[in-house]
Regions:
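Transmembrane-helix boundary/entry motifs in multi-pass membrane transporters
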Residues: 33, 66-79, 118, 206-210, ...
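Select transmembrane alpha-helical segments in multipass membrane proteins
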Residues: 38-43, 76-86, 124-130, 287-293, ...
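Hydrophobic transmembrane alpha-helices that form the pore/transport pathway of multi-pass ion
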Residues: 65-137, 144-156, 344-375
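Membrane interface segments of multi-pass transport proteins and intramembrane proteases
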Residues: 59-72, 311-322
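Juxtamembrane and boundary regions of transmembrane helices in multi-pass small-molecule transporters
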Residues: 50-53, 72, 76, 115-126, ...
Length: 430
């Protein structure tokens, strides 16, 4: 998973479970591609992907960045670039968002006569990619983050979306705030020209058309109920219907069905071209990775394989006599190192079943450990093989390899430092 495409290893992993005799191929296939998390992720790709495909996310991004209140406030303007990227990436994981924001920023620094090798330009280019990664870690409601969230719930214990975001939202805001502070005070990047930039020039010349408005409101309704299904207390009368019978997967599915069924342009055409959106926006390598993650993790923790017994026997000495604080610190350090040396998806999949028995035996804080693992495993920020977004950074022509790795490493260090007090608060309060 570290040095090659994730699709074929995922397929091979599913088939291998049958070859080694753990289960039949039918069971492996249904346990992977038939898993509810895969279905939910596919439907989320349709709903969120429609926003990208028909230009809604670009419209939102330009609207956020063209507010008059940002004029003459260079630090706030750059922070809003990061914050708006994080906000959008809660709902969509399309790498096109990095390319879109790079294109917008490219136009800004050229208008202001910045040299593309200027420290402000190069550090902000990396900062945009960091904001994409950090934003994707805020809420595990889609893609492989959702699979890790559910995997942790199955093997260790429930986290709760409210608790999760209670740590990750301030973590994200503080992380990008810390990176901006580094740019201004340590790197001493020149923000002065941004103060003269007319932010209203970024606004859209046209208003949203009827298709874009319908897609935006569909997404708003779908994501409202997705969050409601996760945050609704079990004592609520609506809980059985919203959280159990329909659930987040059902709301994404209803949204996907609606955009395919609804019409636009006076009923002359469908709201979306389902086949085009699916072809452009559904990431099959990620779906295969999610599916293989769920079924392989199940095999890892099954007593008949003996893998967990082997891990417990060999790592019991590390945790012997140690308390919950040791497990928390150990988890933070190991996950931060490994997720930057190999595929973050694979590391997350492996770490959860490995840590599961020791979380229970040491009386560790179940929600906090889960939040920290899923949050930090997202931060594959250094080596290109760690995550797909980071693979784009060295390819940006404005960056040298030294700059790409320098700013990525600094970004990771800032995120780790920010995570420390959040982990302490979580361990004491959750």
């Amino acid at each position: 998973f570290s040095a090659c495409e994730v699709a074929w290893p995922s397929i091979l992993a599913i088939v291998s479970l049958s070859v080694v005799g753990y289960c039949s191929l039918n069971q492996a296939a249904s346990g992977s591609l038939g898993h509810a998390v895969v279905f939910q992720s596919a439907m989320a790709y349709i709903v969120a992907g429609s926003l990208n495909y028909y230009g809604v996310t670009e419209y939102i991004a330009r609207w956020l960045l063209s507010r008059k209140a940002l004029s003459g406030k260079p630090y706030l303007f750059v922070y809003i670039i990061y914050a708006s990227m994080m906000l959008i990436c809660i709902f969509t994981s399309s790498l096109a968002m990095i390319i879109l924001y790079w294109a917008i920023f490219d136009g800004i620094y050229k208008v202001l006569d910045y040299d593309k090798k200027d420290k402000f330009v190069t550090s902000t280019i990396v900062g945009i990619a960091l904001a994409f990664v950090v934003g994707g870690a805020i809420a595990p409601i889609r893609s492989w983050q959702l699979s890790l969230f559910n995997l942790y719930a199955e093997q260790v214990g429930e986290i709760g979306l409210g608790k999760f975001m209670g740590l990750t939202v301030p973590g994200a805001l503080l992380s990008m705030g810390g990176y901006l502070l580094y740019q201004a005070k340590i790197l001493k990047a020149d923000f002065s020209r941004i103060a003269t930039f007319d932010v209203t020039s970024l606004s859209n010349s046209d208003k949203m058309d009827s298709r874009q408005k319908k897609l935006l409101w569909t997404a708003v309704v779908v994501f409202f109920f997705v969050f409601l299904s996760a945050l609704l207390p079990k004592s609520s009368a609506l809980y059985p219907l919203i959280a159990t019978k329909i659930s987040a997967a059902g709301f994404f599915a209803l949204g996907a069905a609606y955009v395919g069924l609804a019409a636009t342009n006076g009923g002359k055409e469908s709201l979306v071209s389902f086949s085009k959106v699916a072809g452009a926006c559904i990431q099959w390598p990620v779906l295969l990775m999610i599916g293989s993650t769920m079924v392989v993790a199940s095999a890892l923790t099954n007593e008949t394989t003996g893998i967990m017994a082997f891990i417990s026997e060999n790592l019991s000495g590390v945790f012997a006599g140690k308390g919950s604080w040791f497990v928390l610190i150990f988890t933070m350090v190991i996950v931060s190192i490994l997720t930057n040396a190999a595929s973050n998806i694979a590391i997350g999949t492996a770490m959860i079943p490995i840590l599961a028995p020791f979380i229970a035996s040491t009386g560790s804080n179940v929600p906090t450990i889960g939040i920290i693992v899923i949050w930090l495993v997202n931060m594959g920020l250094i080596l290109p093989g760690a995550s797909a977004p980071v693979g784009l950074i060295p390819g940006n022509e404005a960056l040298t390899s030294k700059e790409a790795y320098k700013y990525s490493c600094i970004g990771m260090l800032i995120i780790f430092i920010v995570t420390i007090p959040l982990a302490i608060i979580g361990n004491l309060c959750l």
